[in-house]
Curated annotation (Swiss-Prot):
<dbReference type="InterPro" id="IPR045187">
    <property type="entry name" value="CcO_II"/>
</dbReference>
<keyword id="KW-0812">Transmembrane</keyword>
<feature type="binding site">
    <location>
        <position position="200"/>
    </location>
    <ligand>
        <name>Cu cation A2</name>
    </ligand>
</feature>
<keyword id="KW-0479">Metal-binding</keyword>
<keyword id="KW-0249">Electron transport</keyword>
<feature type="binding site">
    <location>
        <position position="196"/>
    </location>
    <ligand>
        <name>Cu cation A1</name>
    </ligand>
</feature>
<dbReference type="InterPro" id="IPR034210">
    <property type="entry name" value="CcO_II_C"/>
</dbReference>
<keyword id="KW-0496">Mitochondrion</keyword>
<keyword id="KW-0186">Copper</keyword>
<keyword id="KW-0813">Transport</keyword>
<dbReference type="GO" id="GO:0042773">
    <property type="term" value="P:ATP synthesis coupled electron transport"/>
</dbReference>
<dbReference type="Pfam" id="PF02790">
    <property type="entry name" value="COX2_TM"/>
</dbReference>
<dbReference type="Pfam" id="PF00116">
    <property type="entry name" value="COX2"/>
</dbReference>
<keyword id="KW-1278">Translocase</keyword>
<keyword id="KW-0597">Phosphoprotein</keyword>
<feature type="binding site">
    <location>
        <position position="198"/>
    </location>
    <ligand>
        <name>Mg(2+)</name>
    </ligand>
</feature>
<dbReference type="InterPro" id="IPR002429">
    <property type="entry name" value="CcO_II-like_C"/>
</dbReference>
Length: 227
C-alpha cells in the first residue's frame, strides 16, 4: 500500500507489476541520458564563441538525428509491447470474479460458485476501528487465493468507472454495456488497496477496493462459510 509522502511506486505484488517497474526504470534511464545530452549541448552553445552561421546543410548530422531517435523509440516500444501482450494474456484461470461498478460502490460475483456474491461499500470514517485506514476500508473484502491465476470480468451498471489496484499493476475500465477482462496473480498474501480511478460523480473518491489474498486452504474455508 502507499505511505505518506511516498514518491515511488508501491511494492510490486504480481509478475505484471514487477515488469512495469522494470520498464519504468528502463525508460527513466533513457530519458535521463537524453536530458543529460541536451543540457550538455546547450551548455556548449552558451559557453563557446564558435558558431556555424554559414552552414547550409550537414547531411551527417541530419542522418544521425533521424536514425538515433528511431532507435531510441524502438528500445522503448519493444518492452512496452511485450508487457501489453502479457497483460492481455489469460490462460486457464483457476477462478473468475465478476465485478460491477455502481454509484458509488462495487459488487462482486464469484461465477464458479452457485450463490457467492456481495456488495462492497466504504466504511464511514466515524465507524472505523483503531488501526483501520480512512477512505480505504470496506465492509466486504474480496478474498482471493494467492499464487493462482484469477480472471476479473469488469463492467458497470450506470456510468464509467475504473477498477484499479496499483500494487498488482491493475487498472481496467468499467464501461456500461461492455465486459472487460483482466488477470491477476499475487505472489504473497496480504491486504491490497485500490480505488475507482475514473471520475464517476460526487462520491467518486469513496469507492475503495480491498483485496485480501490468502493461501488456497483459507480461501476454501472462507468460500464455504459464505455459501
Amino acid at each position: 500500500m502507499a505511505y505518506p509522502f511516498q514518491l515511488g511506486f508501491q511494492d510490486a505484488t504480481s509478475p505484471i507489476m514487477e515488469e512495469l517497474l522494470h520498464f519504468h526504470d528502463h525508460t527513466l534511464m533513457i530519458v535521463f541520458l537524453i536530458s543529460s545530452l541536451v543540457l550538455y549541448i546547450i551548455s556548449l552553445m552558451l559557453t563557446t564563441k564558435l558558431t556555424h552561421t554559414s552552414t547550409m546543410d550537414a547531411q551527417e548530422v541530419e542522418t544521425i538525428w533521424t536514425i538515433l531517435p528511431a532507435i531510441i523509440l524502438i528500445l522503448i516500444a519493444l518492452p512496452s509491447l511485450r508487457i501489453l501482450y502479457m497483460m492481455d494474456e489469460i490462460n486457464n484461470p483457476s477462478l473468475t470474479v465478476k465485478t460491477m461498478g455502481h454509484q458509488w460502490y462495487w459488487s462482486y460475483e464469484y461465477t464458479d460458485y452457485e450463490d457467492l456474491n456481495f456488495d462492497s461499500y466504504m466504511i464511514p470514517t466515524q465507524e472505523l476501528k483503531p488501526g483501520e485506514l480512512r477512505l480505504l476500508e470496506v465492509d466486504n473484502r474480496v478474498v482471493l487465493p494467492m499464487e493462482m491465476t484469477i480472471r476479473m470480468l469488469i463492467s458497470s451498471e450506470d456510468v464509467l468507472h475504473s477498477w484499479a489496484v496499483p500494487s498488482l499493476g491493475l487498472k481496467t475500465d468499467a464501461i456500461p454495456g461492455r465486459l472487460n477482462q483482466t488477470t491477476l496473480m499475487a505472489t504473497r498474501p496480504g491486504l491490497y488497496y485500490g480505488q475507482c480511478s475514473e471520475i464517476c460523480g460526487s462520491n467518486h473518491s469513496f469507492m475503495p477496493i480491498v483485496l485480501e489474498l490468502v493461501p488456497l486452504t483459507y480461501f476454501e474455508k472462507w468460500s464455504a462459510s459464505m455459501l
